[in-house]
Amino acid sequence: MGNTIIDGLKERISNAISVNQSVGIMLPGNNYSDLTQALFEFMNSKPKTAWVYVTITNPYGSIEKKFGDMFDKGNIRFIDGISRAAGIYEINPNCVFIESPSQLEKILLEIMNAFRDLENNIQKYLVIDSLSSLLTYNDVSLVTEFFTHLSNRTKLEDIHSISLSIEEEMEENISKILYLKSNKIIKVRESFI
């Protein structure tokens, strides 16, 4: 059953991001693990693309432990906004560690730096994991401003984006801006993928 769910999620993500520049994914918390597995399998299946994965939800070390075998193609870079805040101090050449998830300007700067040196003909993708986690550390208005600015920059730079949000943790204003700034919204339900 788990593979069916993951395969269904991969197909929905692939279909959505191939025709839309920005995709918002709203999901219940209990589907988060399946969704992240589907995302990493999808990223791994696209070795000639460049991905930047911004994690506020889980430390890079735990992501590497679970999905590290999918990073060997060298097309996925990470920006970790949670490890340092949790007291985890590691160094990894594949990851930029931000001191705190409240440093939204620094996160934005590192995202744009990660894409800056790539060739123009490479398709670029950004994953934000997750908007709802940013709300734990930041005021709603700051997250709204950050996401609006990020969305505008990625569109100008021709970077496709996937923004995750956990339904149970979302504020109404952030949900509205996610709908406004995303070309496509995928709503994951527990019973239907």
Region locations from a protein language model:
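Phosphate-binding/switch region of NTP-binding enzymes
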Residues: I159, S165-I193
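Short, aromatic/basic amphipathic alpha-helical patches
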Residues: L39-E41, I63-D72, N173-L180
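Phosphate-binding/switch loop-helix module in NTP-utilizing enzymes
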Residues: G87-H149
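Glycine-rich P-loop/Walker A and Walker A-like loops and their local beta1-loop-alpha1 context
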Residues: G2-K66
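Nucleotide-state-sensitive switch-loop elements of NTP-binding domains
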Residues: M70-I98
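Structural motif
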Residues: G24, Y125-I128, I162
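Short, charged/polar "capping" segments at the starts of alpha-helices
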Residues: P59-E64, A86-G87, M170-N173
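Substrate-engagement module of ASCE P-loop NTPases
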Residues: V143-E169
